[in-house]
Structures are given as structure tokens and as C-alpha cells.
Amino acid sequence: DCRYMFGDCEKDEDCCKHLGCKRKMKYCAWDFTFT
């Protein structure tokens, strides 16, 4: 399962599509992509 916005993460692959891992804060945030 992928992590949604503000979910815990270690790397970008942990997050759902269009989300990337903010390594400093360890949460998923939008990566500014639409496709």
C-alpha cells in the first residue's frame, strides 16, 4: 500500500502517485506532477 498525503515515509516510493517523500520531515507531500 502507498502512503497518502502527510503519511509516514522513508523514500519517494513509499508514497502514492503524485506524492514524494519529504526526507527531513518524513512525510509524503505533493511532488507537483499531474500525470
UniProtKB/Swiss-Prot annotation:
One Pfam family per UniProt: Toxin_12
Signal sequence bounds: none
Residues carrying the site annotation May bind to extracellular S3-S4 region of the domain II of Cav3.3 channel: K17, H18
Biotechnology: Can be used to study Cav3.3 calcium channels, since it is a unique isoform-selective modulator of T-type calcium channels.
Main localization of the protein described in the UniProt heading: secreted
GO CC terms: extracellular region
SUPFAM superfamilies recorded: omega toxin-like (SSF57059)
Keyword annotations of the record: Disulfide bond, Ion channel impairing toxin, Knottin, Neurotoxin, Pharmaceutical, Secreted, Toxin, Voltage-gated sodium channel impairing toxin
Protein location: Secreted
Keyword Secreted: yes
Any coiled-coil regions, as ranges: none
Cystine residue pairs: C2-C16, C9-C21, C15-C28
Distribution of this protein across tissues and organs: Expressed by the venom gland.
A single MF term (Gene Ontology): sodium channel regulator activity
Residue spans crossing the bilayer: none
Other comments on record: Negative results: shows weak effect on hNav1.8/SCN10A (IC(50)=50 uM), and no effect on rKv2.1/KCNB1 (tested up to 300 nM), alpha-7/SCN9A nAChR, alpha-3/SCN3A nAChR (up to 10 uM). Shows no activity on hCav2.3. Shows no or very weak effect on Cav3.1 and Cav3.2 calcium channels and on Kv1.7 potassium channel.
Assigned protein family: Belongs to the neurotoxin 10 (Hwtx-1) family. 28 (Jztx-11) subfamily.
Its biological purpose: Gating-modifier toxin that targets both voltage-gated sodium and calcium channels, with described activities on hNav1.1/SCN1A, hNav1.2/SCN2A, hNav1.3/SCN3A, hNav1.4/SCN4A, hNav1.5/SCN5A, hNav1.6/SCN8A, h/m/r Nav1.7/SCN9A, hNav1.9/SCN11A, hCav1.2/CACNA1C, hCav1.3/CACNA1D, hCav2.1/CACNA1A and hCav2.2/CACNA1B channels. According to Deuis and colleagues, shows a preferential activity on Nav1.7/SCN9A (Nav1.7/SCN9A (IC(50)=0.9-4.4 nM)). Another study shows a much less potent activity on Nav1.7/SCN9A (IC(50)=1457 nM).
Record remark on domains: The presence of a 'disulfide through disulfide knot' structurally defines this protein as a knottin.
Protein name (record): Mu-theraphotoxin-Pn3a
Organism expressing this protein natively: Pamphobeteus nigricolor
